[in-house]
């Protein structure tokens, strides 16, 4: 069950990249958000400047009738009509980590930004420098398998989550494919449910950010 904080509910889900990973992640998110009373008003923001090509129809979640249309706009319209999700399309590219950070500042203060990802140290360093003045210890790692490994990496006893985990108001997930995305989303939900029973309600994030594109910069 997805649980959340009454004092600080999730209000935004931002997906960067609507291609092979993003196009198959968005329907999972849209269905999840609209199936719960307390998340049905969460805004699902889709960011991608690319258009649908014929070759995309073979492995991405698009059909031939959508060729030449912007991917973010196609998915936003599809799941707004299909699931009545609060979708919003941003039809332009975010070419770098720095540009991603600038865009996200429109949603939350830099000091409130957290990170959940298992990407390369180079990306982690860039993210940490943008949003974590105190360095890497301010951020959070979450593996696609279990949240116990997250606790282990942060020097905690297996199964025990540190008070610093999810202490910020946003969560960042970097996915490498649709299977990875599904694992990470489910792990996040499980972790939020676990924390609901052991942490202060103020410890919950109010935004989830999913990076399913821009693989070339990592």
Regions found by a protein language model. Name each.
Residues 1-218:
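Adenine nucleotide-associated cytosolic modules
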């Amino acid at each position: 069950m997805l649980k959340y904080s009454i004092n600080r509910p999730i209000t935004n889900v931002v997906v960067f990249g609507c291609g092979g990973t993003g196009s198959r992640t968005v329907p999972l998110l849209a269905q999840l958000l609209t199936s719960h009373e307390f998340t049905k008003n969460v805004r699902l923001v889709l960011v991608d400047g690319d258009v649908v090509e014929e070759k995309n129809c073979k492995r991405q979640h698009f059909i031939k009738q959508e060729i030449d249309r912007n991917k973010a706009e196609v998915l936003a319209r599809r799941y707004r009509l299909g699931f009545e999700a609060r979708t919003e399309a941003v039809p332009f590219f975010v070419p770098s980590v720095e540009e991603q950070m600038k865009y996200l500042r429109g949603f939350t203060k830099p000091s409130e930004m957290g990170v959940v990802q298992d990407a390369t140290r180079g990306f982690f360093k860039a993210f940490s420098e943008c949003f974590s003045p105190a360095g890497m210890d301010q951020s959070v790692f979450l593996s696609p398998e279990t949240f116990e490994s997250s606790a282990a990496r942060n020097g905690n006893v297996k199964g025990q989550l540190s008070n610093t985990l999810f202490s910020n108001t946003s969560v960042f997930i970097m996915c490498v494919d649709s299977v990875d995305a599904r694992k990470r989303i489910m792990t996040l939900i499980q972790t939020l449910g676990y924390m609901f029973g052991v942490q202060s309600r103020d410890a919950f994030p109010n935004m989830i950010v999913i990076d399913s594109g821009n693989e070339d910069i990592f």
